[in-house]
A protein has these predicted regions:
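A membrane-interface helix-boundary motif in multi-pass transporters
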Residues: 1, 188-207
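C-terminal membrane-cytosol helix-exit motif in multi-pass small-molecule transporters
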Residues: 1-24, 209
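Extracytoplasmic gate region of multi-pass secondary transporters
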Residues: 36-97
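Structural signature of the two symmetry-related core transmembrane helices
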Residues: 108-123
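Intracellular juxtamembrane helix-capping segments at the cytosolic ends
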Residues: 146-159
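A late C-terminal transmembrane helix in Major Facilitator Superfamily
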Residues: 158-193
């Protein structure tokens, strides 16, 4: 997902925000996309693949935290304590990502959104110490902070704001589906004998591939 998104999203996309004045100077019209038009745009599906990684991986990890704890032989309160790292880093990233979006634009940040989550799956795959729980959920929190801001601003930048309500409704529905998918997928993989390391590998492969 990351390499494909990198090559496609930072190219010649006309923005409806900071670049509007430049476009107006050249007498170019900014297109306001309707939802049906968005559904016909291949870039939309590539961006969705990037944005939906966080919901299904994080939800699966939250729901099956007892399985993760037993597999890693962590104490009963380790993951609960790790949520502090998740929450703190999520909030910090929310503020930082807002500044970065204003400076660089959402489309340029989107390609980096899942990198912390990718490193988190690597940590979960290779390390068993209790500290790795804090690192994993902390990295998930960083991606969560980025995703919460980019999940709104990206669509407005690329597809305009006139029909942003219907577009955002569509992407929110897909996000909800993604969380349900993550829970089902984690459960299925556990039932057929996958270890948490195997699941981390599958998750990391999805992000990178």
């Amino acid at each position: 997902v990351l390499p494909v998104a990198t090559s496609l999203l930072v190219k010649d996309v006309k923005l409806d925000t900071r670049e509007e004045s430049k476009i107006d100077e050249n007498n170019k019209e900014i297109k306001q996309w309707k939802r049906i038009e968005v559904l016909k745009d291949y870039r939309f599906y590539i961006m969705c693949m990037t944005m939906l990684a966080m919901p299904w991986i994080a939800t699966g990890s939250f729901v099956y935290q007892s399985f993760i704890s037993s597999s890693k032989e962590w104490g009963p309160y380790v993951i609960a304590q790790s949520f502090m790292a998740y929450s703190i880093l999520s909030v910090i990233t929310l503020f930082i990502s807002g500044f970065l979006i204003d400076k660089f634009s959402s489309r340029k940040l989107l390609i980096y959104m899942n990198i912390p989550l990718l490193f988190g799956t690597i940590v979960l795959y290779y390390f068993d110490a209790s500290l790795s729980s804090f690192v994993f959920f902390g990295l998930v929190g960083v991606t969560n902070g980025l995703a919460n801001v980019l999940g709104s601003s990206t669509w407005a930048e690329i597809y305009g704001v006139k029909y942003i309500g219907s577009i955002k409704a569509l992407t929110t529905a897909l996000m909800v589906f993604s969380t349900a998918f993550g829970t089902a997928l984690f459960g299925f993989l556990i039932d057929i004998g996958f270890t948490i390391e195997d699941i981390a590998f599958v998750s990391g492969t999805y992000i990178f591939g």
